[in-house]
């Protein structure tokens, strides 16, 4: 079933004038919250979800003795989720399998090529990258094609609480990629970890 067919069945019609392109970059197998975020994107009528890129959480798997190949497990989790939702028109891309080796590292993979291709597409709709894990794929794409920086906006769920800061999970999975992203010319909307927590009013 196509995503917009599902939206139509739910009574939603995507307003073309407000359409924005979205690519989701996710470590979906790491925690269950990514699945909810993915479905939220897919069921938002204004979002033209162009694809979903799987990213790794290899630092966690190494430190905690968990099964390796975290990117592949995230890829399979996204496929499972789309299958359960009967959505078959959104491509899922394999991402980088490990953190960047250096600030100049530019590994090639399906996700990196897809990010570059979509950023360079001749399309008036703005492109947003919803980053829900390590930003390795995005940083590698910026290293391979710096010209895409002005053609997309990255919404990054990562970084310690503002303004004090502290080590944070998504940063720890690839701190070099975070530095590449923040040093680039791309517009970044950062959502620190403290803004993802619900708290009672004091």
Region annotations inferred by a language model:
Residues 111-112, 136-137, 155-182:
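Active-site glycine-rich loop that binds ribose-phosphate moieties when present
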Residues 20, 43-121:
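Glycine-rich nucleotide/cofactor/substrate-binding loop typically near the N-terminus or early
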Residues 196-202:
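Conserved small/polar residues in nucleotide/adenosyl-binding loops
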Residues 34-44, 139-143:
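Histidine-anchored nucleotide/phosphate-binding helix
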Residues 1-14:
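Positively charged, low-complexity intrinsically disordered leader regions
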């Amino acid at each position: 079933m196509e995503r917009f067919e599902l939206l139509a069945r739910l009574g939603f019609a995507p307003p073309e004038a407000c359409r924005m392109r979205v690519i989701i970059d996710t470590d979906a197998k790491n925690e269950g919250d990514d699945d909810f975020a993915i479905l939220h994107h897919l069921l938002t009528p204004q979002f033209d979800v162009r694809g979903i890129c799987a990213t790794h959480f290899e630092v966690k798997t190494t430190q905690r003795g968990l099964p390796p190949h975290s990117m592949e497990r995230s890829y399979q989790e996204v496929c499972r989720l789309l299958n359960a939702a009967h959505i078959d028109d959104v491509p899922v891309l394999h991402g980088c399998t490990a953190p960047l080796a250096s600030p100049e590292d530019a590994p090639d993979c399906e996700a990196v090529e897809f990010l570059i291709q979509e950023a360079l597409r001749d399309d008036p709709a703005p492109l947003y990258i919803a980053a829900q894990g390590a930003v390795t794929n995005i940083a590698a794409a910026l290293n391979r094609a710096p010209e895409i920086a002005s053609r997309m906006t990255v919404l990054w769920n990562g970084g310690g609480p503002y303004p004090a800061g502290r080590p944070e999970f998504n940063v720890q999975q690839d701190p070099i990629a975070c530095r590449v992203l923040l040093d680039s010319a791309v517009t970044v909307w950062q959502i620190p970890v403290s803004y993802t927590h619900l708290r009672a009013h004091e």
